[in-house]
């Protein structure tokens, strides 16, 4: 292929890529299934209990109940509802974009168990006697009053029932919906608004399969009630008792505002990454921008393909993935720069870097996969969305940042147009050696030669131990400020166009017949408020408070309620997630490198986790489920940085082959850190830029999540440089002292020329 044809191929491919994305991006964005926190709606987790004593809740009963709930949801007209059966006796319902949340929740939890009883409250007919789908809301011809009509399966049975009632002294046929133990017709008949729907006198047997319920419906509200009863009867009754043990509702405006802010923050973060890559890496940086844009597009396409639900943490994961994709590019570009500095041509440097960087990228991303997989397995809906996006992002990193980026760069490199333009790859001519000098990439001088990381690590490890001890004391004294996800209770978030005052919020809570345990006013110009209750509010209390807030402040609030049972489970799952992620990482690193590297990596990770926990404890920052997602992300991301350094340690061990002195170990540690320092700084800078943008411009609801990421990223860079690798060096020195003849053979070359690291 001629020089010009490669450039033409590059330009044509880029034009096709961007033309394809430009033509379809609107439909891709339109088809993104937004979660509750981005478009409003609600999520309820029901505990399914037997309605009658002695009944059992088995798999069949759960599936039947889920089907009935789905029928009711279809009546509400909600697009793409999610109804999931969860073992052993739970059903999760997610309705995004539902307009009347109160009505929807009432419709879902109602048993819709219609019974026809006599005046002594004895059951004569039940919902099982009604023909499926026969219920209608109609109007009486004479009075135009709303009614509900339905047909019975057996008209002879209905005739027999009406005949029996007609012969009684108190000859009324009472229609009940969801009759409860203790309910009584005679008591309710004395009230202005009785619980039963209607009570009609029966003077003679009715020889018909049609039943009409009337008298209990008046005006427009009566029409609405009659229509709802008809729809519930057609959807089917629930032969079980549903108890809400977790609920989360978000107002549409609240969700839209969160989406707008986070998208804006993400745009700023990604734009700054693009500028950095172009300024620091120049021509390869331009290729990286093309690959990163494709990465965002393809990740969203894949997310739509698997029908993923995009939540706020999921959106953050998408942007965080951009930082991780940048890392894959930076690893390769730094390798290219090293190869250019020892005197190789651009084409040779590209070829060599292409081979040497792949395994490093693979290893570093696989550890993040472990953390994301654990998050997906143990997390609830919003955390699952985060984990799903993270897993897809890592897959797309290999598609775009590895394969697409390399292919595009190979077209430019092989064209030879940039043959001697080393500055376009970020390397000055006076920094290049002659290839005949025989300089190895591992012998190149860096900007950090004056830094003795082994010497610096000793006092810094001491400082870290001191921080851990102080952190333990802080944790013991202050404890963690657990959010309702773990402590149970109810949290209400809302915003207003006007400044909110403590007194106004207190009054609204008081008017709702409640007493708040904590009220916080925050946000720009005090326009955001958070109200917390230690008790989990009932649905009726939720509804009343929501209506009062909307009336006073003009915003439908986000209400999150967690029962003590769920709070305990979430806390348990959070601990298990952290333990399993750590075990998975230590096993993988031990297999790919050595157990000392795995152990020192996990100790560094635990240090990062503890730093985040200690800071959150000291400053009384609330810990919720997204905090756990942030911690596990740091676990996966911090190990990413550590593995890149350990990969360079492995290369340096390969060069040394045999270790006989502790000075050699110190030298390997120092050189490995120095050689990967630029990559570490550049990578963390690109990710921190995104995190800081979301921290300052993103939605308030993910502020704590983003803050935990920010603290973890800073701590992660510190621990990978001053804890993980130096700790490995300390353990390696002990191994050397205990070894026979005071000698360690760390590398042997097989006859097949395959590498073999002995550690």
Residue ranges and their predicted role:
Residues 1-759:
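A structural signal for conserved, well-ordered secondary-structure elements
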